[in-house]
């Protein structure tokens, strides 16, 4: 499945390079219209990251997100600085289909376990942003990749599997925004080890061949942001390579 994505800062569509706010590219696009165009191209799931909220939780773009979700018939998953159960409640009440939770799952797993119990596995997607060292250890980063979380990807998955984990978005930080190709070996490994989880791949997609490679890796879907925004290929072309299941 192709999952078109946009990142928002103060209502503006942007892309960051490897999570760095100082390395920002702005796009003169209306976020609602952009997601509607992806919907019209056939996307079955859309992804939005609230980078303003990620940086300052008091400035979350919840009202804009609610307006965007209301304009779409396609499910919208939203992440970016989810720091509490109240943040999750607010987004789901705003019409978001699924909330993407990263740092909170690392730092306060008991809070997220209660959210799984309250909302079920389809309403929550874990965001596991990993730095992979020379020995292949996959350590999860937190707070917009500014800090190490001190936990491995595998240990976090093991924590949440009994609670009903169904969806996980994994980004190889070294590939994000680089358009150097996705880390297909990572997704092959995860899909084989944790085949109950629907893995969403993210980071590095530059060509339709990259899309095809991830399709065969065992991942259930791929998040594509920059390649669509810069016109390398269209959402329609990507979906033709990897039709919705």
Curated annotation (Swiss-Prot):
Its EC number is 5.3.1.16. Gene3D superfamilies: Aldolase class I. Pfam families: His_biosynth. It comes from the Bacteria. This is 1-(5-phosphoribosyl)-5-[(5-phosphoribosylamino)methylideneamino] imidazole-4-carboxamide isomerase. Pathway: Amino-acid biosynthesis; L-histidine biosynthesis; L-histidine from 5-phospho-alpha-D-ribose 1-diphosphate: step 4/9. The keyword Signal does not apply. GO terms for biological process: L-histidine biosynthetic process; L-tryptophan biosynthetic process. GO terms for molecular function: 1-(5-phosphoribosyl)-5-[(5-phosphoribosylamino)methylideneamino]imidazole-4-carboxamide isomerase activity. It is found in: Cytoplasm. It catalyses: 1-(5-phospho-beta-D-ribosyl)-5-[(5-phospho-beta-D-ribosylamino)methylideneamino]imidazole-4-carboxamide = 5-[(5-phospho-1-deoxy-D-ribulos-1-ylimino)methylamino]-1-(5-phospho-beta-D-ribosyl)imidazole-4-carboxamide. InterPro entries: Aldolase_TIM, His_biosynth, HisA_bact_arch, Isoase_HisA-like, Isoase_HisA-like_bact, RibuloseP-bd_barrel. Keywords: Amino-acid biosynthesis, Cytoplasm, Histidine biosynthesis, Isomerase. Transmembrane segments: none annotated.
């Amino acid at each position: 499945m192709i999952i078109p994505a946009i990142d928002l800062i103060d209502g503006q569509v942007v892309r960051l390079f490897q999570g760095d706010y100082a390395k920002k590219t702005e796009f003169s696009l209306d976020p609602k219209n952009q997601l509607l165009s992806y919907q019209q191209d056939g996307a079955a799931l859309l992804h939005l990251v609230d980078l303003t909220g990620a940086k300052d939780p008091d400035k979350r773009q919840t009202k804009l997100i609610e307006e965007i979700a209301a304009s779409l018939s396609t499910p919208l998953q939203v992440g970016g600085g989810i720091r509490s159960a109240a943040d999750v409640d607010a987004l789901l009440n705003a019409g978001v289909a699924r909330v993407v939770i990263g740092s909170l799952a690392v730092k306060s797993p008991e809070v997220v376990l209660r959210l799984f119990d309250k909302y079920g596995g389809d309403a929550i997607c874990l965001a596991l942003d990993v730095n992979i060292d020379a020995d292949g250890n996959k350590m999860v980063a937190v707070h917009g990749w500014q800090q190490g979380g001190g936990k491995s990807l595998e240990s976090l998955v093991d924590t949440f599997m009994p609670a009903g984990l169904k969806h996980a978005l994994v980004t190889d930080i070294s590939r994000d925004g680089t358009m150097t190709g996705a880390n297909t070996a990572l997704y092959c490994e995860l899909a084989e080890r944790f085949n109950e989880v629907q893995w969403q791949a993210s980071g590095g997609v530059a060509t339709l061949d990259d899309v095809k490679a991830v399709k065969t890796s065992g991942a259930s879907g791929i998040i594509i942001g920059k390649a669509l925004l810069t016109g390398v290929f269209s959402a329609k072309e990507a979906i033709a390579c990897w039709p919705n299941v």
